[in-house]
UniProtKB/Swiss-Prot annotation:
Disulfide bonds join 3-22, 17-37, 39-51, 52-57. Belongs to the three-finger toxin family. Short-chain subfamily. Antiplatelet toxin sub-subfamily. SUPFAM superfamilies: Snake toxin-like. This is Thrombostatin. Expressed by the venom gland. It comes from Dendroaspis angusticeps (Eastern green mamba). Keywords: Cell adhesion impairing toxin, Disulfide bond, Hemostasis impairing toxin, Platelet aggregation inhibiting toxin, Secreted, Toxin. It is found in: Secreted.
Length: 59
């Protein structure tokens, strides 16, 4: 699976993942969009990530 992994509004970069999903989320404390491999359950007051299961689905 290929996922985007750039921070915020930087030019898109990708990575090949061993996971079966990609995520995209906006962190509330700094407003920065984060992207990467996998899907996880957030702790505390972190926002829930948007997860998807196809190549480059987290732009």
């Amino acid at each position: 699976l290929i996922c985007y992994n750039q921070l915020g509004t930087k030019p898109p970069t990708t990575e090949t993942c061993g996971d079966d999903s990609c995520y995209k989320m906006i962190w509330t404390y700094d407003g920065v969009i984060r992207r990467g491999c996998g899907c996880f359950t957030p702790r505390g007051d972190m926002p829930r990530p948007r997860c998807c299961k196809s190549d480059k689905c987290n732009l």
